[in-house]
Regions:
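C-terminal lobe and adjacent flexible extensions of AdoMet/dcAdoMet transferase-like proteins
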Residues: 198, 218-274
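Catalytic cores of RNA-modifying enzymes
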Residues: 1-218, 247, 258, 274
Length: 274
């Protein structure tokens, strides 16, 4: 899709990119096909799309003979959605806030995949929503801010809170980087496609999720500090308790939070008494 074609489409529907919703329309449709390929879409699949906008990804999906449920918050795209619904019996939509929509009830009993170009400002919340959903998707293939994508797919040495919160439940991999000039209007930062595959069976045994995330938040609030300092200062633990616990787990007290593996965090959570 050329910039001229996109502008004509926007003009025909009287649409304007909404800065409040962080709308940037992708012009390079080969990226859309790459996302569909990465998700291993096959005929009959149920696809959940968030933020269909002008419907270019939606139409590509429907060409693959899948069922698509699109969630759109911005009412200006209603004419586009109505046109798609009129032309495709396998397409349905909800005009609502994705962060408040009950996907688990709507898709109860139906396996589904999420494929979407999501606004930067809700990226983290959307990903977390599906990690903790009662009815989780098989996978998520998302176009998002490059920095966030690489944070999610981080490895020990550069781990962070969102990486751990996703990788406890799924495997994540950055597929490709999409430069800002591929969008209209062009965002100030580059984007990336990330593919997240949910674990079919739990990979990790989490005994107390609330406790685990209390520890993680406390430690990553000072991630440049050494682990023993964050545990002592942010969780009000005595130096003796911290020293003995880390020694028992054979964790270097001088290590920084981003260097720990998920297994080490889980062991630490099991040992600490808060």
């Amino acid at each position: 899709m050329t910039i001229e074609t996109l502008k004509n489409l926007l003009k025909s529907y009287k649409l304007n990119p909404n800065k409040t919703y962080g709308q940037h329309f992708l012009m390079d449709e080969t990226i859309l096909e790459d996302m569909i390929d990465e998700a291993k879409v096959k005929a009959g699949d149920m696809i959940l799309e968030i933020g269909p906008g002008i419907g270019n990804l939606t139409e590509r999906l429907l060409e693959h003979k899948v069922k698509v449920l699109s969630i759109e918050k911005d009412p200006q795209f209603l004419p586009v959605l109505k046109t798609l619904q009129k032309e495709h019996e396998d397409f349905s939509y909800e005009l609502t806030d994705a962060l408040k929509y009950n996907f688990s009830d709507r898709l109860k009993g139906t396996p589904y995949k999420v494929i979407a170009n999501i606004p930067y400002y809700i990226t983290g919340k959307i990903v977390q929503l599906f990690m903790h959903a009662a009815h989780k998707p098989d996978s998520l293939t998302l176009l998002m801010q490059k920095e966030v994508a690489y944070n999610i797919a981080a490895k020990p040495g550069s781990m962070n809170l969102i990486a751990i919160s996703v990788q406890l439940f799924a495997d994540a991999r950055v597929v490709c980087v999409v430069p800002g000039h591929k969008f209209h209007p062009a965002p100030k930062v580059d984007s990336a496609v990330i593919h997240i595959t949910l674990h079919k069976k739990p990979k990790y045994k989490i005994k107390d999720e609330a406790k685990l995330f209390r520890i993680l938040r406390a430690c990553f609030s000072g991630k440049r500090k050494q682990l023993h300092n964050t545990l002592e200062n942010n969780l009000q633990l005595s130096k003796q308790v911290v020293t003995e616990t880390l020694s028992k787990l054979k964790i270097d007290p001088m290590i920084r939070p981003q260097q720990l593996t998920i297994e080490q965090w889980l062991n630490l959570c099991d040992e600490l008494k808060l």
